[in-house]
Regions:
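Glycine/tyrosine- and acidic-biased, solvent-exposed loop/turn segments at the edges of beta-strands
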Residues: 2-127
């Protein structure tokens, strides 16, 4: 590989690529734009978007077997909106909504329903 495209960061350990982060840009020294990181095997580990150095928008994390582990939305670096967590075999383990980092509304955890303070109206439908 003689050229590396702008915005692509490679991290090498003992000559092998173990993490590749694809960043669309840095804005004033902060991560800004979509990113992906990978396990040493090359399997996708996580993907999402940064805005002004913080997670913002949909973010997904994966197990080493490629199965989705967790997905949820962020706003200004805080969990904000619907989140779901899965087992290594793909079964839904938990599900709920965050309001700027705080659980709200009904959550399903290990098959049980847990109720927190109500979500604001703009989050009631999972937005």
């Amino acid at each position: 590989m003689s050229e590396i495209e702008p915005g692509v960061i490679f991290t090498f350990i003992l000559g092998s690529v173990f993490l590749i982060s694809l960043l669309s840009d840095f804005l004033f020294g902060k991560k800004d734009g979509p990113f992906e990181s990978y396990y040493r095997s090359g399997q996708l580990k996580e993907k999402g978007t940064h805005k002004d150095g913080e997670l913002d928008g949909l973010c997904e994390e994966y197990y080493k077997n490629g199965q989705l582990s967790e997905k949820g939305t962020y706003k200004d670096g805080e969990p904000h909106g619907p989140f779901e967590g899965y087992s290594k075999n793909g079964q839904l383990e938990w599900k709920g909504t965050y309001n700027m980092g705080e659980e709200c509304g009904e959550w399903i955890e290990d098959g049980e329903t847990v109720t927190y303070d109500p979500c604001p109206p703009d989050l009631e439908d999972g937005n």
